[in-house]
């Protein structure tokens, strides 16, 4: 293999596959080796001349410390189920539907201060004098409840089994292992200990070139039920980034009292379809500042020890949003992330302020794919072809794979296919890197989140679609490989300076009405609707998908009905007769829709 056709590839390894690792390094042209969760790095491979990544867990893999400091174990806000009172006394079980291997109710801190019982029929907070918690039964007992009102309890729970470790253990059917407890690096004792622990790790691993942080401090929201099935997931969720220690800091800095409801949000947990309120946005900004400061401490130690600092974009990544200003202050050398499609590739490749970016391609070498009868080649093809067009728009600098290499060795056709992928990637990179791709227009995706959700719009879980949002996410996916200069803006951006629209050719507003993706009640602000109308009046384009600007207000459901020439019938206008049923079947839109085969990211 020529020198030009080697490099830019990272390969996983383990103690039991040393010769095979060396062979595949040659075949795939790999110039970096990594360990993974559940594997160990072989000493024999330290002399290969390859760059060595060490996966480093800032918040787990040290149960001795976690058990000795239970007060500094990480916590999560959870809302109980909805329960209807039929008399004045009501018992609400807190952990019903939640794995007790994953979470443990926190009674160490003042529950009357940090918990909240809410009458969901009125939205009012129930006085702390009207309820208490019975630790033995695991229930909150509400007194003087209003019959036939619904109630919930918002409470803090310790994360006693790291959710990612739990997922890996369940997926791989691990036996005879200890549950890894998630400790909180933000808190004083663990903060001090973690810096010493990191320095010691660097000193004891002189052969390691890159510390691959997986990740920093707070896991995205991931909960499992009693059967260890995924119950709730939000790849952008902040509900597992809380503790009384953190919340007291927030109160001191922001000047107002924190409510659990700022996180709980009626049980929606401020997922990306919810229009974020001021308090939640304040909390996000606070977390980004604090996480960036602490992450910088670790990166500085890494650099002092002569190593590079790489961050995995996922798992405990909350607070490190790479498109926000705070990210650049961390000082990372690189970012690596999982590539599930074109959107998630751009989520990595569009990151600025690092020396290089890397995409971990699928499938991950786990038994859920690599088993008798499994078809890893099919998954690898779909993954590569889906991401390929996005690479041509904005390439990542490296690719790699992860998991148990031993499993992949039983699939020779897969090994052959990955070899072809590595060669093709290097060829694409050599031709695309440093060039400016052709752009037809400048496009802005407009929603309530803006740049903080760049390339992640409509992504509930990483690169996974739901039937309800598949078409919306598909718009973002199409943009990832299309000839447009794409940016993501928020309604707040327009309110701050509507001149931001002068540099844009087309605005896209995509999603269901009354969600964060279309704006909801923000359309009651005439500044917004007037700015968009003026933009179109002066020659700009507006594309709405789903229920653009959808919100019932002042005689319209679609607030730009005059602009887009269509209104949604909600029943409110059935009294108006309609006579214009003329169809223009030869118009370019229906003609294109019927006959045109659009290019997709799935062309093989």
Regions found by a protein language model. Give the residues of each.
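The substrate-binding groove and active-site-proximal loops of carbohydrate-active enzymes
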Residues: 7-12, 32, 174-191, 276-291, ...
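Polysaccharide-binding and catalytic clefts of secreted carbohydrate-active enzymes
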Residues: 70-329, 347, 433
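Catalytic domains of carbohydrate-active enzymes, especially glycoside hydrolases
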Residues: 17-44, 48, 200-212, 387, ...
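Conserved small/polar residues in nucleotide/adenosyl-binding loops
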Residues: 594-603
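A short, well-structured beta->alpha microelement
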Residues: 10-22, 37-38, 311-319, 478-498
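Hydrophobic targeting/anchoring helices
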Residues: 45, 63-66, 198-199, 209-216, ...
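Aromatic-lined substrate-binding rim segments of carbohydrate-active enzymes
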Residues: 38-75, 227-235, 298-301
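A glycine-rich, often tryptophan-bearing local segment used as a flexible ligand/cofactor-contacting loop or short
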Residues: 514, 518-593
């Amino acid at each position: 293999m020529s020198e030009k056709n080697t490099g830019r590839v990272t390969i996983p390894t383990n103690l039991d596959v040393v010769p095979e690792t060396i062979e595949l390094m040659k075949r795939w042209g790999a110039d970096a080796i990594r360990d993974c969760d559940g594997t160990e790095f072989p000493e024999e491979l330290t002399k290969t001349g390859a760059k060595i990544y060490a996966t480093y867990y800032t918040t787990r893999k040290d149960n001795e410390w976690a058990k000795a400091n239970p007060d500094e174990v990480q916590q999560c806000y959870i809302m109980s189920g909805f329960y209807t009172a039929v008399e004045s006394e009501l018992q609400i079980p807190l952990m019903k539907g939640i794995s007790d291997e994953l979470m443990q109710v926190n009674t160490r801190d003042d529950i009357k201060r940090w918990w909240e019982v809410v009458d969901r029929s009125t939205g009012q907070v129930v006085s702390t004098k009207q309820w208490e918690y019975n630790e033995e039964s695991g229930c909150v007992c509400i007194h003087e409840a209003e019959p036939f009102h619904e109630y919930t309890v918002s409470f803090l729970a310790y994360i006693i089994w790291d959710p990612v470790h739990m997922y890996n253990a369940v997926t791989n059917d691990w036996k005879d292992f200890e549950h890894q407890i998630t400790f909180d690096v933000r808190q004083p004792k663990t903060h001090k200990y973690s810096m010493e622990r990191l320095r010691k790790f660097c000193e004891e691993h002189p052969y390691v070139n890159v510390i691959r942080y997986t990740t920093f401090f707070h896991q995205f929201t991931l909960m499992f039920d009693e059967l260890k099935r995924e119950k709730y997931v939000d790849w952008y969720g902040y509900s597992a980034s809380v503790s009384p220690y953190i919340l007291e800091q927030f109160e001191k800095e922001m000047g107002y009292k924190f409510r659990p409801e700022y996180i709980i949000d009626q049980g929606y947990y401020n997922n990306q379809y919810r229009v974020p309120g001021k308090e939640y946005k304040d909390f996000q900004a606070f977390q980004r500042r604090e996480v960036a400061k602490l992450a910088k401490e670790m990166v500085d130690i890494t650099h002092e020890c002569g190593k590079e600092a790489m961050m995995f974009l996922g798992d405990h990544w909350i607070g490190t949003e790479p498109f926000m200003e705070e990210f650049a202050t961390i000082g990372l050398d690189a970012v690596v992330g999982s590539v599930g499609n074109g959107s998630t590739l751009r989520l990595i490749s569009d990151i600025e302020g690092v020396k290089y970016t890397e995409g971990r391609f699928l499938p991950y070498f786990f038994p859920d794919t690599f088993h008798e009868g499994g078809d890893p080649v099919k998954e690898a093809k779909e993954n590569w072809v889906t991401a390929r067009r996005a690479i041509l728009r904005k390439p990542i600098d490296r690719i790699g794979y992860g998991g148990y290499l031993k499993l992949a060795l039983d699939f020779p056709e897969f090994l052959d296919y990955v070899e072809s992928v590595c060669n093709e990637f290097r060829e694409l990179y050599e031709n695309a890197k440093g060039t400016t791709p052709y752009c037809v227009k400048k496009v802005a995706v407009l929603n309530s989140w803006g740049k903080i959700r760049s390339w992640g719009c409509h992504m509930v879980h990483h690169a996974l679609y739901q039937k309800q949002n598949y078409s919306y996410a598909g718009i973002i996916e199409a943009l990832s490989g299309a000839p447009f200069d794409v940016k993501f803006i928020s309604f707040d951006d327009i309110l701050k300076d509507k001149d931001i629209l002068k540099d844009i050719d087309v605005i896209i507003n995509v999603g269901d009405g009354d969600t964060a993706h279309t704006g909801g009640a923000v359309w009651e602000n005439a500044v917004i609707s007037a700015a968009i109308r003026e933009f179109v009046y002066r020659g700009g384009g507006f594309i709405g998908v789903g229920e653009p600007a959808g919100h019932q207000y002042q005689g319209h459901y679609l607030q730009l009905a005059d602009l887009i020439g269509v209104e949604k019938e909600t029943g409110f206008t059935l009294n108006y007769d309609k006579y214009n049923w003329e169809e223009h079947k030869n118009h370019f839109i229906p003609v294109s829709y019927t006959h045109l085969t659009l290019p997709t990211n799935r062309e093989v």
